[in-house]
Amino acid sequence: MSSVVVVGTQWGDEGKGKITDFLSEHAEVVARYQGGNNAGHTIVFGGVKYKLHLIPSGIFYKEKICVIGNGLVVDPKALLEELKYLHDRGVSTDNLRVSNRAHVILPYHLKQDELEEASKGDNKIGTTKKGIGPAYMDKAARIGIRMADLLDREAFKEKLERNLVEKNRLFEKMYDTEGFTVEEIFEEYFEYGQQIAQYVCDTSVVLNDALDNNHRVLFEGAQGVMLDIDHGTYPFVTSSNPIAGGVTVGTGVGPAKVTRVVGVCKAYTSRVGDGPFPTELHDEIGHQIREVGREYGTTTGRPRRVGWFDSVVVRHARRVSGLTDLSLNSIDVLTGIPTLKICVAYKYNGEVIDEVPANLNILAKCEPVYEELPGWEEDITGVKSLDELPENARKYVERVSELTGIQISMFSVGPDRNQTNIVRNVYEA
C-alpha cells in the first residue's frame, strides 16, 4: 500500500496542480478531498494547457480512477461545464467518480456568498463568490443537500422546499432582496443530477478497495495550509481543511493508510485576497516576481500579492500536516535578483517569534527577520538535478530545506511538466 498526499504549504497557488499531475503518472487513483471549484490549477498535458477547478488532475490518464471525495462541495452546473470543457478537447471522463456524500452548491449559496461579502465593506475576506462558504455552513448546520439527495427526486424537492423557507427569509429580512422559488431551481438542478448520476458512487469504498489491493493512491489538496479553517490565518481562510488531516474526513480513508505527505511551496511566497502577509513586497522586486512568475489567480484572474520565502509559515505547515517531503517550485523566478531574502523568524514588540501567532492583530504587526543570500544570474530552466544548479541557487535550495526541516524530494525550474525534477521517489521512500 502506497498513498501520497499533496498539500500546499503557503496560501495556495504553490503549483500543486503541476506536482499532482506529475505524480499522477505513477498513481492508479487520484482523489480530491476538500474545497470546490474555488480552487483553480493549470496543467500542461501533451503540450496542451488545461485549466481545471473541480476535477482531479489525473483525469487525463484514462486508466486511472479520479475521485471527487465526500469532503468537497460540488456545484453541479460548474461540474458539467468542466466535463464539457474536457469532452470538447477530446478528454474522456469515464474514469471519474463523485462521492454520493459530497454536498451540493445551489443558486442560493452563490447569492448568499455574494451578498455576505458585499455587506462586509472593508472587512471583506476575499471570497471567490463560488458559494463554497455558505454550502459548508449548511453542511455544519445539517441542512445541506448531498449528491445522494440530488439524485432522489422526492428527497431533493422536500429538502429544497424546506431550505428555501429559511434562505428566502434571510435574503428578504437581512439583505432586502428577493429569494428563489422552488420552480426556479428544482427541475434544472434535478436534471443536472441526472447528467452526473453515472459518476456518483460511494467513493470511500473505491479508495479503500484500491489501498487494500496495494494500488498507489494520490490525494490532491486544494488551497494551502495557511488557508485551512483551523490552522490558517483565520478568518482569511477557506471553509475546509486543506491540511493532510483533511484526507481522512474528506475521503473516508483512515489515517493509518496515508504513507507520505508532500508539501508544495514556491521559492517565494504569494497570496490572493486579504489578510496578514509578513514578507509581502511592495517594491520593484515584488513587481518583477509577480510578472516573471505570472502571479495571477487561475480562478479569479486577480493579481497575487508576493513576498520573500517565509520559513516560519512552511515550518507551521510541516507541523500541522506532518510533511515528510518538500517540492520546491518556481526557483527560476528568482533568477537575476542580486540579493535574496528568507524569513527565518518574526519580531513582535522586540521579541523574536518562531511560530505563526494565532492572533491576527499580532501577526499583522510582526516584522520579518531576514537572512540574506546571494542570488544568481545563470539560466536554470533546463536544469535536471540539484547538482546542475549554480552554486548560489543550490545553496538557496539547501537553506530552504534546513530552515523548514523538510527534505527536498522534488524541485521545479519552470512551469512545464518537463521542468519538474525528482530528487527522491515519494512512492518508494
UniProtKB/Swiss-Prot annotation:
GO annotation, cellular component aspect: cytoplasm
Residues that, per the record, bind Mg(2+): 13, 40
UniProt cross-references to InterPro entries, sorted A to Z: Adenylosuccin_syn_GTP-bd (IPR018220), Adenylosuccin_syn_Lys_AS (IPR033128), Adenylosuccinate_synth_dom1 (IPR042109), Adenylosuccinate_synth_dom2 (IPR042110), Adenylosuccinate_synth_dom3 (IPR042111), Adenylosuccinate_synthetase (IPR001114), P-loop_NTPase (IPR027417)
Reaction equations catalysed: IMP + L-aspartate + GTP = N(6)-(1,2-dicarboxyethyl)-AMP + GDP + phosphate + 2 H(+)
Pathway: Purine metabolism; AMP biosynthesis via de novo pathway; AMP from IMP: step 1/2
Molecular functions (GO terms): adenylosuccinate synthase activity; GTP binding; magnesium ion binding
Protein name: Adenylosuccinate synthetase
Protein's organism: Bacillus cereus (strain ATCC 14579 / DSM 31 / CCUG 7414 / JCM 2152 / NBRC 15305 / NCIMB 9373 / NCTC 2599 / NRRL B-3711)
GN (gene name): purA
